[in-house]
Swiss-Prot record:
Positions of Mn(2+) 2 binding: 237, 242, 260, 321
Domain of life where this protein originates: Bacteria
Protein's recorded name: Probable cytosol aminopeptidase
Gene: pepA
InterPro entries xrefs: Leucine_aapep/pepB, Macro_dom-like, Peptidase_M17_C, Peptidase_M17_leu_NH2_pept, Peptidase_M17_N
Cofactor note text: Binds 2 manganese ions per subunit.
Locations listed in the record: Cytoplasm
GO term, biological process aspect, one: proteolysis
């Protein structure tokens, strides 16, 4: 399906065309449709389809960007399997670039669903959603360019996260990254295999993957435009499957663990979009791709691991593995001398407990940087909130036999203590330049919500893109 913007209404009333009208509840109440719709019990909240007119009415409380974005998804979903090839969409109110972008992005992201493993799928009749801009209020070319690039990146990230673990191994992610660099053209790709990881002394990363028959990979994608204003390095947790290791997860908790690679997939999606948009920011995406499995060679609670930074780590829980992969990747990332360093990870269930399944957690030492990222995230349509570090929780990761322990000694504050663990491996010169984004909640939800399908949402991609674009304007 594609989206477009038209400066005149081409609706001819033919059988393959439909219309959608988006309006606020207050406007609906005064509209000529109100009396008819109310006779069918529709009071102006949600959507109502007038079949004879092939007209979908979509009513929202007010025409804010979040409501418009979600309405775009609702329109696309409604017509997804109906026998209409194109839908003309009109917004009853002033149109501008941000509203047009929100509606069309919502449509492209809302229509996505993972059907790769179904043997029978309903046909997608809908070919195009056309936004009407009769007053010529929208910079159509730039809006459409960004919409298509961002939507494609998010949907590709969703698809690779949804890819099953028997297919999506660390080698698979590495192959995908190589193909991505060739497709985009202005991306470079470097892959570190097991031998290279040993030379890099990534003892924590390697320990996590030890019991897997699928070897680990570190993936390094880079976008280096001439005269770049800043260098931003992104790090993503790429656990292609996580059974918990010897600290084995309960069976119900293992389901959906194919999504433990969401952070790694997100940073690939972000750099792809940034490169295609031609942003004047140098960006690197580093993905630690591994599997946390069980076996005679598995790393164990009571082990002490040595990280690339030289710090020793007492292992008390092998299911706190993502942070072990991340610390070695963050060490590698700091060698690139970033102006800003951000990691994305489905790191803790505790973050979901703290913020719910629709909101990501932002952590770090720089309040201004955290506020900037949260602002960009909210503008992109992603819910994020700051979780504050504190000295009391830091004491929970102290170890009596090593430099630091991989889990806190309390059942409380797990999202923050995990962030504080990562902070132990951030060099002093980068403390104020680093952010940790825990996307454990929204990365994979087993129900449709907002503009997201059941399954992978592509959490972090839109927020990361907007943040980097904002840095280019700063």
């Amino acid at each position: 399906m594609k989206v477009s913007i038209s400066h005149k209404n081409n609706f001819k009333g033919v059988s393959y065309q439909a219309q959608a009208l988006l309006m606020s509840k207050s406007v609906f109440a005064k509209s000529p449709y109100a009396k008819l719709c109310k006779s069918f019990g529709f009071e102006g909240e949600g959507k109502f389809f007038l079949q004879e007119q092939a007209l979908l009415l979509v009513c929202v409380e007010e025409l804010g960007l979040d409501s418009i974005r979600e309405a775009g998804a609702s329109i696309a979903r409604h017509f997804r399997t109906l026998p209409y090839k194109n839908v003309n969409v009109a917004l009853n109110g002033k149109l501008d670039d941000s509203k047009a972008y929100a509606l069309l992005l919502g449509a492209l992201l809302g229509v996505y669903e993972c059907v790769s493993y179904k043997t029978k799928t309903p046909p997608l009749h809908l070919k195009e959603i056309i936004l009407l801009d009769e007053k010529n209020e929208v910079a159509s070319e730039s809006v459409l360019k960004k919409v298509h690039i961002v939507a494609q990146s998010v949907n590709e990230v969703r698809e690779i996260i949804n890819t099953i673990p028997q297919v999506a191994t660390p080698k698979y992610l590495a192959k995908y990254a190589k193909e991505l660099s060739k497709e985009v053209g202005n991306l470079e790709c470097k892959i570190l295999d097991e031998e290279a990881l040993q030379k890099e002394k990534m003892g924590a990363f390697l320990a996590v993957n030890r019991a897997s028959c699928n070897p680990p990979r570190l993936i390094h994608l880079s976008y280096k435009p001439k005269g770049a204003k800043k260098r931003i390095v992104l790090v993503g947790k790429g656990l292609t499957y996580d059974c918990g290791g010897l600290s084995l997860k309960p069976a119900d908790f293992m389901v959906t663990m194919k999504a433990d690679k969401s952070g790694g997939c997100a940073v690939m999606g972000i750099i792809k979009a940034i490169a295609q948009l031609g942003a004047n920011i140098e960006v690197h995406s580093i993905i630690g791709a591994a599997e946390n499995m069980i076996g005679g060679n598995a790393y164990k609670p009571d082990d002490v691991l040595y990280s690339r930074e030289g710090k020793s780590i007492e292992v008390r829980n092998t299911d706190a593995e993502g942070r072990l992969v991340l610390v070695d990747c963050l060490s590698y990332a700091q060698d690139l001398k970033p102006d800003i360093l951000i990691d994305f990870a489905t790191l803790t269930g505790a973050c979901v407990v703290a913020l719910g399944e629709f909101t990501s957690g932002i952590m770090g030492h720089n309040d201004r940087l955290k506020a900037q990222f949260e602002k960009c995230a909210l503008e992109s349509g992603e819910l994020m909130a700051t979780l504050p570090f504190n000295r009391h929780l830091k004491k929970l990761i102290e170890s009596k036999i090593a430099d630091v322990c991989n889990v806190g000694s309390s059942r409380y504050g797990g999202a923050i203590s995990a962030g504080l663990f990562l902070s132990e491996f951030i060099r002093e010169e980068f403390k104020q330049k680093w952010l940790h984004i825990d996307i454990a909640g929204p990365a994979y939800v087993e129900k449709e919500w907002d503009i997201n399908p059941s399954g992978a949402s592509g959490a972090g991609v839109r927020a990361g893109i907007e943040f980097i674009l904002a840095q280019g304007k700063a």
